[in-house]
C-alpha cells in the first residue's frame, strides 16, 4: 500500500464539501490504490464544528478502505500542516445587497490567512485548487500570500474552471447528439465568471471537427455559438440557483475531483481547462490567474501552445482579462 497523501479541505461541512469528501475518500480523486488523510477545516464556530463532526461520522460509516484517518480543526495551521493537496472550498457567499467589491474584500481576508498558512506549513510541493468564488482572484490572493514565505511556488496554485469546461462539454453533447466523452480539445479562457470564453474552434468529436458539426462560419452556427452556447455556459451557475434555490454543489465537487485527478495522474495528452498563473502565453500578462487549455503529465500542467487566436476570440479573451485586472486592483491593498 502506498503512503497516505494528506488532503486539506476547507469549508468541509458545507454543501460542496459534503459532496466532495466521499468522492475523495473513495479513491475517485487520487486513484484506487492511494490512501488519504483528510485534514478538514471549518470556521471555529460551535455549530460548524459540530456539523463537521457529523460529516466525519458518516465518512467513518462508509468504511472506505482508502481513508487512513481524519482531522477536524478550526485552525488553518493545523489543516494545512504537511498537506500534499489543498482544496480551498470555503468562501464567503455573496449576500443580499453585497457589491462584488465587498465580496472580494470579505474573501480577501479569508484567502490571505489561508495562503499564509499554506506558505508556512504545507508540503512545499502542495497542489492547491481554489473552488470558492471569486475563484481566480481568491487563488491569486492565496498565491501571493503564500509566496511571501518562499517555500511554495506560484505554479502550485490553481483556480477551478473545470466546472465551466464540463458544462461546455455537456452543452456540445446536447447540441450535436454525440456522447460527452467523445469531445476533445475544448478550452475555456479567462475568469470563472460570466465573462469566461468557452472556445470550440479546435474541438473534435469522434474525429469530426466540432466547428463543422456546429456550422460555425455560417450565420446560423455563429449565432448559436455567440448568443446561446457561450452565454449558457457562462450563466449556468445562475440558472442552477434559479432552479434549485441553492448554488451548484455536487457538480462543483465533481469538477474539483476531475481537476485534481488530472493534475495528479495526468491527462494522456488530452486538453483540460485550469485556472493557472499565466506565464505570458497568448499575451495574457504574467502572474494573472487565468483559464487556459492545458495538458498534465507527471504532476505538472503545461499550457497548450501555438493556437491561433482570431479577432472574435481575442476580444472575448481581453474582456475577461479586463475583469480579472479590475478584481486584482480591488484587492491590491490587501497584499
Curated annotation (Swiss-Prot):
**EC annotation from Swiss-Prot or TrEMBL:** 1.1.1.37
**In Gene Ontology terms, what is one molecular function of this protein?**
L-malate dehydrogenase (NAD+) activity
Recorded hits in CDD domains, A to Z, give:
MDH_chloroplast-like (cd01338)
Catalytic residues, chain numbering? 192
Q: Which residues bind NAD(+)?
A: 11-17, 107, 114, 131-133
Tell me what reaction this enzyme catalyses: (S)-malate + NAD(+) = oxaloacetate + NADH + H(+)
Top-level lineage group? Bacteria
Pfam families linked: Ldh_1_C (PF02866), Ldh_1_N (PF00056)
What does the record give as the organism's lineage?
Answer: Bacteria, Pseudomonadati, Bdellovibrionota, Bdellovibrionia, Bdellovibrionales
Q: Say what the protein does.
A: Catalyzes the reversible oxidation of malate to oxaloacetate.
Biological process GO annotation list?
Answer: malate metabolic process; tricarboxylic acid cycle
Q: Does the keyword Oxidoreductase apply?
A: yes
The name this protein goes by in its record: Malate dehydrogenase
Annotated substrate binding sites: 94, 100, 133, 167
Keywords for the protein's UniProt record, in alphabetical order: NAD, Oxidoreductase, Tricarboxylic acid cycle
User: Per the UniProt entry, what species is this protein from, by scientific name?
Assistant: Bdellovibrio bacteriovorus (strain ATCC 15356 / DSM 50701 / NCIMB 9529 / HD100)
For this UniProt entry, which residues form the secretion signal?
none
Which NCBIfam families does UniProt cross-reference here?
Answer: MalateDH-SF1, PRK05442.1
UniProt cross-references to InterPro entries, sorted A to Z: L-lactate/malate_DH, Lactate/malate_DH_C, Lactate/malate_DH_N, Lactate_DH/Glyco_Ohase_4_C, Malate_DH_type2, NAD(P)-bd_dom_sf
Amino acid at each position: 500500500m502506498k503512503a497516505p497523501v494528506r488532503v486539506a479541505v476547507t469549508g468541509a461541512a458545507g454543501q460542496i464539501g459534503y459532496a466532495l469528501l466521499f468522492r475523495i475518500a473513495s479513491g475517485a480523486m487520487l486513484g484506487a490504490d492511494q490512501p488519504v488523510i483528510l485534514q478538514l477545516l471549518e470556521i471555529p464556530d460551535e455549530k460548524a464544528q459540530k456539523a463537521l463532526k457529523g460529516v466525519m461520522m458518516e465518512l467513518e460509516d462508509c468504511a472506505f478502505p482508502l481513508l487512513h484517518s481524519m482531522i477536524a480543526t478550526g485552525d488553518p495551521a493545523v489543516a494545512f500542516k504537511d498537506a500534499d493537496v489543498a482544496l480551498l472550498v470555503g468562501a464567503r457567499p455573496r449576500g443580499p445587497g453585497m457589491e462584488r467589491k465587498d465580496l472580494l474584500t470579505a474573501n480577501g481576508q479569508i484567502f490571505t490567512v489561508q495562503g499564509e498558512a499554506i506558505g508556512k506549513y504545507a508540503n512545499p510541493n502542495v497542489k492547491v485548487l481554489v473552488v470558492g468564488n471569486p475563484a481566480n482572484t481568491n487563488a491569486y490572493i492565496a498565491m501571493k500570500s503564500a509566496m511571501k514565505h518562499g517555500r511554495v511556488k506560484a505554479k502550485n496554485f490553481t483556480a477551478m474552471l473545470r466546472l465551466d469546461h464540463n458544462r461546455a462539454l455537456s452543452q456540445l453533447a446536447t447540441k450535436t447528439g454525440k456522447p460527452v466523452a467523445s469531445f476533445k480539445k475544448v478550452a475555456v479562457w479567462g475568469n470563472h465568471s460570466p465573462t469566461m470564453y468557452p472556445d470550440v474552434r479546435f474541438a473534435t468529436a469522434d474525429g469530426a471537427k466540432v466547428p463543422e458539426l456546429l456550422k460555425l462560419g455560417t450565420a446560423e452556427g455563429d449565432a448559436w455559438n455567440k448568443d446561446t452556447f457561450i452565454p449558457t455556459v457562462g450563466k449556468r451557475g445562475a440558472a442552477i440557483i434559479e432552479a434549485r434555490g441553492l448554488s451548484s454543489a455536487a457538480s462543483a465537487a465533481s469538477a474539483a475531483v476531475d481537476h485534481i485527478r488530472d493534475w495528479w495522474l495526468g491527462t494522456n495528452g488530452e486538453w483540460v481547462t485550469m485556472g493557472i498563473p499565466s506565464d505570458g502565453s497568448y499575451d495574457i500578462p504574467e502572474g494573472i490567474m487565468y483559464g487556459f487549455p492545458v495538458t498534465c503529465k507527471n504532476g505538472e500542467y503545461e499550457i497548450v501552445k501555438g493556437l491561433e487566436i482570431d479577432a472574435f476570440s481575442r476580444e472575448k479573451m481581453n474582456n475577461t482579462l479586463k475583469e480579472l485586472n479590475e478584481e486584482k486592483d480591488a484587492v491590491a491593498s490587501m497584499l
